[in-house]
Amino acid sequence: MPEHNNGLTYHLLRVPLRTGSLYPRSENDAQAYRDAHLLRCLEAAGCQVFDEGDVAIPSYLPHHNIPPIKNWPGPRIAWDCIGECIAPYLQQPGHIPLLISADCSIVVGTAQALMRVYGEEVHILYVDGDIDGVAPQPERCLSAAAMARWMAT
């Protein structure tokens, strides 16, 4: 294994969530990263990484199509769970939570947790296959995932 020389420790967390996403059964998409041995690949690249399992998300979250935000307040509850889970890692210098999810809306909870620790000067690199920047519309029910970037800014 290559020598770990950047002093960073990564904490791999899966976010089993679909409340903010459009498609059902996407809550287990992060399993594909585990099946592809992401942890082993990161270790082979010299990273110190720990598989911390799943972020605890309640199973009772609502599922509905009531405008303007699908399944609300489910996404808000999930974002709070994410923030509580990653807060201890963010408070340790050199520890980085690496969140894997099929639900783009987790960027909101992650950004909020980062801002609680680091203040307003948080910068996020958001990589996705589409824009996720739709603004809420009172007459249309949209997923929180579709509005993720809009809500995070």
Predicted regions and their residues:
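Conserved alpha-helical scaffold segments that buttress catalytic/binding sites
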Residues: 2-153
